[in-house]
Amino acid sequence: MKSLMTSIALLSLAATAVAQDQQLGARTKAMGGSYTAFEDDPVSVWLNPAGISTQPDQLSIAYQTYTAYPKGRVRGPGDTVDFTVEPSTVMGDPALLPSYIGFVFQVGDAAAPLAIGVCYAQPYLLNYAMDQVKDPNQPVFVPEAEVQQVFGRFRISAAKDFRISDVGTEGFFTHVSAGLGLDVGYTRWHFSGLGEDTTTSNVGVGFGIGGLLGVYDNYNSFKVNLGVAYTSKVSYDFQIDPDILPAFDMPQQLNVGFTFYLLQGTPLRITLDFQWIDWSSTAQEPLFSNFDGFEDAMNYSIGFEYRLTVSERVSLYPRLGFRLFDAPWSDKDDLPMTGPFRLVLDTKDEVFTLFTYGVGISWTTEAGKVRSVDFAGDAGGDAINFAIGLTMEF
């Protein structure tokens, strides 16, 4: 069975790489994007590779939507045509491709867990309307052009868990896990407007590293994990010149988070996370010094999950979360510039307070394998977004 699933994994991921999200996974989204100290979710292959170290063989697939700012047209007064740049909810590109598909293979044993993970992740989909600025004192900006860029990443990772104290022994610093992922990044870029209609694609390499520490565990009603993960930037060697047409690299990011397991049997989980995303180094410096460039984002999240026992084999997981989401601009009325192009879009704010929600249901088969389906949504941003996921042990 394992060899069959391995073959399926490699074939699926190969197809994905050929065909080509910020917080990936329905469970992650429902809990405010708070995920760095997860140790039981196969999406950790991407989120924090150390988190898969003790996981069993399993598969995870997730679809989700993204916020885009496409250029549209509406009829204005008389026979005029007005441009619109309103936010909208869109599927990934292509729509049939999952935002995440990944596999975990446990190749160690209970005494010395060692896991291998493979995945394809699409964490970002950019769709911005822009205006080419030729005068530093230009007062009005019109969405003359549109840039669309999809970022995907194929990863293979390994994670090892090291016991510090024996299982069942209450105390601090019970175990530590370390994980490393090697990545091939893929981007597809399209620019339209100003007499241009250009599409290109490119690949680059990157990596991700992560650690997970069991801070405390009484094996009864209280447990704390600390997770740290870093994902490198992927730089692309475009055939177009970013000084002439706007294009972005895939940003590096750093995540630090805690997970708390509470109450008898630990049915309650609370997660806290901080995330830094280096958007400032992914774009060109503004052509004119009186315009702002893209800035880094710092996001803060808290999530809640509670396990409700429906039957001996079925559990229900209601989830809630809050996320302080930082857009890569400092002023919604003075949007950033990359090279000679300034963003032109309708946005509500610079920092958004997102309310997230979701539910999961899991069941155990007669063979003892766990299956789960998860749904999530969020509100409070420029557009609402949703995610759905499937996880299954094999």
Please give the residue ranges for each predicted region.
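A broad, structure-centric signal for solvent-exposed, well-ordered loop/edge residues
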Residues: 7-8, 38, 311
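N-terminal, post-signal peptide beta-strand-biased segments of exported outer-membrane/organellar beta-barrel
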Residues: 16-122, 346-350, 355
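Outer-membrane beta-barrel porins/channels
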Residues: 20-29, 98-394
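Short intrinsically disordered, low-complexity coil segments enriched in acidic
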Residues: 2, 80-87, 199, 204
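Cleavable N-terminal export/targeting peptides
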Residues: 1-24, 166, 170
